[in-house]
Amino acid sequence: MVSQRRDADAPKSILESLAGTRVLVVEARYYDDIADELLAGARAAIEAVGAEARIFTVPGALEIPSAIAILMEAGRKAGGPYDAAVALGCVIRGETGHYDIVAGESARALMDLSVSEHLPLGNGILTVETMEQALARARVSEMNKGGGAAEAALSLLAIKRAANLEPAR
């Protein structure tokens, strides 16, 4: 997680300051077994700090940035905005150039969205060469990249709050 200087008015724990936050999780379930592991890791990391995960599913990695943008706006308009977002999916290299487009454009769109909207966003879209690499990175018992993506989003949210850009709930 994030470390911060301990001022007198700083929260006792960054983790305590994240309790009750709403985290949007958008997952691509193109590979169900990988998606299950990524989601389990992300959900565990979010719940560990007392935050709430709201999960939506899209067909593939390229749809994730658009879905996050749509759902963030819908949350704002409904009066229940999300505090952070997590993108989960997997792109495995094939025989064509499709991998390069999906991997590059999904990452670019997520970064553009995060920077332009000041959105704490964790990118858990795996870009790998083989199914074995994907499983090793997705499994909670191994590299737990879903949990890592959620922790990244929560760390960015803590930074945003420490900078007084967003009040704690």
UniProtKB/Swiss-Prot annotation:
5-amino-6-(D-ribitylamino)uracil binds at Y30, A61, L62, E63, C90, V91, I92, N123. CDD domains: Lumazine_synthase-I. InterPro entries: LS, LS/RS, LS/RS_sf. The keyword Repeat does not apply. It catalyses: (2S)-2-hydroxy-3-oxobutyl phosphate + 5-amino-6-(D-ribitylamino)uracil = 6,7-dimethyl-8-(1-D-ribityl)lumazine + phosphate + 2 H2O + H(+). It comes from the Bacteria. One of its GO terms (cellular component) is riboflavin synthase complex. (2S)-2-hydroxy-3-oxobutyl phosphate binds at E95, T96, R137. It is an enzyme of class 2 (transferase). GO terms for molecular function: 6,7-dimethyl-8-ribityllumazine synthase activity. Its EC number is 2.5.1.78. GO terms for biological process: riboflavin biosynthetic process. Keywords: Riboflavin biosynthesis, Transferase. Pathway: Cofactor biosynthesis; riboflavin biosynthesis; riboflavin from 2-hydroxy-3-oxobutyl phosphate and 5-amino-6-(D-ribitylamino)uracil: step 1/2. The keyword Phosphoprotein does not apply. Belongs to the DMRL synthase family. This is 6,7-dimethyl-8-ribityllumazine synthase. It comes from Methylorubrum populi (strain ATCC BAA-705 / NCIMB 13946 / BJ001).
